[in-house]
C-alpha cells in the first residue's frame, strides 16, 4: 500500500501489515489499560493497629472507672491509633507481551490511516527554537492538536513545541499507544515511517 506525502507530489510504499491491518479494539484496549497501569506509582502506606508504635498496656482497669472498657490505645477508634484497613504499597503493573504491544501499535497506525489522521511528510523542522515559527508552520497545514514523530529528536523542534499545549514532539523510540490515540492528528516524516516499519516488523 502507499501513503501520500503531503509536502511532495509522491507516495511512500509501506507494509500493509503495519499500516493496513484490521482494527483490533480488544487488543488496543488491553495494551492502553496496561500502559496506564504501569505508569502508576503505587506508593502509599498507612499503619494497622499492629504496626503503630506504642504501649501494649491496658490504659485503665476493666471495671469500676465509669469509662468505656479499653484494652489498647492503638485501636482504630483512638486518636493516633491504627487504620482499620490500612492502605499498603501496591504493584499495579501488567505484563504485555512484545508481540501484543507491537500488534496494538500496528492496529492504531492502521486506524489512523483509515481515519485520515496520519499525515506523512518528506521532512519537518524549524529554523530556530521559536514557538511562533512552529505555530505558523502548523497553521499552514491546518494542524493544531498534533503529535509530531521524527526519526530522532530535533532540539529546535522540541523546544519550539514545548510551550504549545496540544503539540508534542517524539522520536520513533518514544511513541506509545496512549499518545497516538490522544492527539487529533499524527504528523510523521518519511524517515520515521521507515523506522516505525523496522521497529514493528
From Swiss-Prot:
Chain ranges passing through the membrane: none
List the residue ranges of the region (Disordered). 46-71
Organism superkingdom? Bacteria
Entry GO MF terms: rRNA binding; structural constituent of ribosome
Keywords tagged on the record: Ribonucleoprotein, Ribosomal protein, RNA-binding, rRNA-binding
Question: Which terms does the UniProt entry file under GO BP?
Answer: translation
Q: Cellular component GO terms, alphabetically?
A: ribonucleoprotein complex; ribosome
Do you know which InterPro entries this protein is assigned to?
A: Ribosomal_uL4 (IPR002136), Ribosomal_uL4-like (IPR013005), Ribosomal_uL4_dom_sf (IPR023574)
- Report the sequence similarity comment from the record: Belongs to the universal ribosomal protein uL4 family.
Subunit comment: Part of the 50S ribosomal subunit.
- What function does this protein fulfil? One of the primary rRNA binding proteins, this protein initially binds near the 5'-end of the 23S rRNA. It is important during the early stages of 50S assembly. It makes multiple contacts with different domains of the 23S rRNA in the assembled 50S subunit and ribosome.
Would you tell me the protein name for this molecule?
Answer: Large ribosomal subunit protein uL4
Amino acid at each position: 500500500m502507499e501513503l501520500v506525502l503531503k509536502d511532495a507530489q509522491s507516495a511512500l510504499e509501506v507494509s500493509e501489515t503495519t499500516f493496513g491491518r484490521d482494527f483490533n479494539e480488544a487488543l488496543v484496549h488491553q495494551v492502553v489499560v496496561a500502559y496506564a497501569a504501569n505508569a502508576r506509582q503505587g506508593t502509599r502506606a498507612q499503619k494497622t493497629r499492629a504496626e503503630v508504635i506504642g504501649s501494649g498496656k491496658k490504659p485503665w482497669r476493666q471495671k469500676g472507672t465509669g469509662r468505656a472498657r479499653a484494652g489498647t490505645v492503638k485501636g482504630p477508634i483512638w486518636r493516633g491509633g491504627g487504620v482499620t484497613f490500612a492502605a499498603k504499597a501496591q504493584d499495579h503493573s501488567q505484563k504485555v507481551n512484545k508481540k501484543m504491544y507491537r500488534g496494538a501499535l500496528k492496529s492504531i497506525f492502521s486506524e489512523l490511516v483509515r481515519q485520515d489522521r496520519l499525515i506523512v511528510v518528506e521532512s519537518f523542522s524549524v529554523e530556530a527554537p521559536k514557538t511562533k515559527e512552529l505555530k505558523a508552520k502548523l497553521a499552514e497545514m491546518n494542524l493544531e492538536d498534533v503529535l509530531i514523530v521524527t526519526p530522532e529528536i530535533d532540539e529546535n523542534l522540541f523546544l519550539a513545541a514545548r510551550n504549545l499545549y496540544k503539540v508534542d514532539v517524539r522520536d520513533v523510540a518514544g511513541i506509545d499507544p496512549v499518545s497516538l490515540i490522544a492527539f487529533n492528528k499524527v504528523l510523521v516524516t518519511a524517515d520515521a515511517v521507515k523506522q516505525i516499519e523496522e521497529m514493528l516488523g
